[in-house]
Amino acid sequence: MAPRSFWKGYLKLSLVTCPVVMAPAKSEKEKLRFHTLNRATGNRVQSRYIDSVSGKPVDSADQVKGFPRDDQSYVMLEDEELDSVALESARTIDIELFAPADSIDWIWYDAPHYLTPGDEVGEEAFAVIREAMKATKMVGISRLVLYRRERAVLLEPRGKGIILWTLRYGDEVRDPKLYFDAIKDQKPVPELLSLVNRLIEERVKPWSPEMASDPVQDRLRDIIEAKKTPPAKKTKAEEKTGKGSAESNVIDIMDALRKSLGPAAKKPKGR
C-alpha cells in the first residue's frame, strides 16, 4: 500500500493535462522531536507572540507581515496583497520549459518529492510526458506553491514515476568563484596522486542508505532509554583529559599515505 499523499493537483504540458498526487521523498518520521519544558515543574512551555515595546501578547488577528525600512520602521503588507502576487493556480504544475538533464548543477536541487498519476484515466498522459523526457534526456521546469511559498520546481523522470525537486532561488546560491578562485593551482606529485588513487580504490563500496545514517539519533535514543530506567546507583563518569603526546604540525603526506595503504605501499628496493 502506497503512503498517503500530501498534495493533489494536475500536471499540464500545453493541452495535455492529467491528475497527479505528490508525497515527500524524505521522511521525518524517525527523527526525534523534543518539547521545551519548565525544569522546575516538568510542564511544557508555550510560546506566544509579544509586542516588542509594550510587552503585551498579540492576537493572531492583529498580526501582519512587515518589511523593514532603512529608518527602522516597517511597510505593512496585508494577506490580500501577498496573495495578489502568488500563482493563479496553486494546484497545477504547468511545465513552462525544458532543460538538458545534465546542465543543472546539483547545488540548485533542494527537496525531492514523488509524483505519481492521480487516477487510472490520467496514467496514459502521465506516461507520455515521462517517457518523452526520458527519450530526450530533458527535465521539466515549472513553478508551484509548496509549504506556503512559491517555488521553482524541476521534474525528473525516474522509473515509472517522476521526481519533483524544489529548486533553490537564484539569489540563494553563492557564486563558487568567490571562494575557489583564491585557491592556488597546484599540480600534485605523480607518486602522491598514485597512492591516493590506490587508497580510493581500496575504499570503494556500492552505495547504500547506511552510508548516510544519522548516528546522533541513535545515541540520543540510547540516552532516552537509559533515562527511562535510571540505574539503582549513580556512577560518576571519568573525565577525559585529552592529554597525549603532541603531534608535529608538519606531516609527511607520503609517509601517511603509505601507512594508510599498509605493507604493500612500501617503497620498492633500490629507490
From Swiss-Prot:
Keywords: DNA damage, DNA recombination, DNA repair, DNA-binding. GO terms for molecular function: double-stranded DNA binding. One of its GO terms (biological process) is DNA recombination. Residues 12-194 form the Ku domain. Pfam families: Ku. Residues 225-249 are annotated as: Disordered. Coiled coil: none annotated. It comes from the Bacteria. NCBIfam families: Ku_bact. With LigD forms a non-homologous end joining (NHEJ) DNA repair enzyme, which repairs dsDNA breaks with reduced fidelity. Binds linear dsDNA with 5'- and 3'- overhangs but not closed circular dsDNA nor ssDNA. Recruits and stimulates the ligase activity of LigD. Belongs to the prokaryotic Ku family. Homodimer. Interacts with LigD. This is Non-homologous end joining protein Ku. It comes from Methylocella silvestris (strain DSM 15510 / CIP 108128 / LMG 27833 / NCIMB 13906 / BL2). The gene is ku.
